[in-house]
From Swiss-Prot:
Part of the ABC transporter complex MetNPQ involved in methionine import. Responsible for energy coupling to the transport system. It has also been shown to be involved in methionine sulfoxide transport. It is found in: Cell membrane. PROSITE patterns: ABC_TRANSPORTER_1, ABC_TRANSPORTER_2, METN. Pfam families: ABC_tran, NIL. Residues 2-241 form the ABC transporter domain. One of its GO terms (molecular function) is ATP binding. It catalyses: L-methionine(out) + ATP + H2O = L-methionine(in) + ADP + phosphate + H(+); D-methionine(out) + ATP + H2O = D-methionine(in) + ADP + phosphate + H(+). It comes from Bacillus subtilis (strain 168). InterPro entries: AAA+_ATPase, ABC_transporter-like_ATP-bd, ABC_transporter-like_CS, ACT-like_dom_sf, MetN_ABC, MetN_ABC_transporter-like, NIL_domain, P-loop_NTPase. Its EC number is 7.4.2.11. One of its GO terms (cellular component) is plasma membrane. This is Methionine import ATP-binding protein MetN. The gene is metN. Belongs to the ABC transporter superfamily. Methionine importer (TC 3.A.1.24) family. It is a peripheral membrane protein.
Amino acid sequence: MINLQDVSKVYKSKHGDVNAVQNVSLSIKKGEIFGIIGYSGAGKSSLIRLLNGLEKPTSGTVEVAGTKINEVNGRGLRKARHEISMIFQHFNLLWSRTVRDNIMFPLEIAGVKKSERIKRANELIKLVGLEGKEKSYPSQLSGGQKQRVGIARALANNPKVLLCDEATSALDPQTTDSILDLLSDINERLGLTIVLITHEMHVIRKICNRVAVMENGKVVEEGEVLDVFKNPKEQMTKRFVQQVTEPEETKETLQHLLDDTASGKMVQLTFVGESAEQPLITEMIRNFNVSVNILQGKISQTKDGAYGSLFIHIDGDEEEVQNVIRFINDKQVKAEVITNV
């Protein structure tokens, strides 16, 4: 559905060239939800502007829904954009128009008959859960409702690809989850390919099939979400994974415990998939002559399974402690002894 081959984007400035996107190659499958994550300045927004043709790449090929976006202009580009739609962080609604009129706006521009515009708008209002708000104005809506209008408007022309540029960044956590649930539902119902740009790993964890991590204009890591959670290779990726797998203030807590612990081992257990549901601690206490203290932990769900991190302190005879660690690894649970934070 989407293929980027050796794509680069260089902006000229009075201080020299700015390499916003550097040699990015990605392949996004039809019907999947693909996440692109990175901190501010990583090149995410520049990349999404290349996908919808708002910018031309300095080099490389951008193909979306069978069209090489970098090679078309004018009418050809406008036609290609009918297959690509977008929602934004700040909604970009027309404040003088009602919910229904906002949704009908792209159809109006496309020259669709009024009766068909109204029919399509009503279908979309039902799809995004805004029944009863048809005649409301944006100023009368909550942030989540405004984004639902934005999603409905983006779907008006039956696009094949939906680009989401930090679409939940301006929302509270509960509303964020409701919007992500809606996007996941739309993906399943319509088979829509969704590309999510975000700096929040929670968004990736909740609904994405695959993820690419960007830093300084480059894709530094890419893969299935659960695989990336399980084995993050780059330091940047590890920091993102820690956002959702470790409780806040983990570093300070562990350092305090390390300083106060005279014996035993502090161990981080990493669970993936079915291993997250094993009664591991019970078996350790039952089968070995050690004491086990649970320090803190967290389990998160991805679309492909559970991922969890648990910090424990194991105390006892050195040989018996090592036996416990081998036992843990035999259970397909990663065990890492923490010596410093």
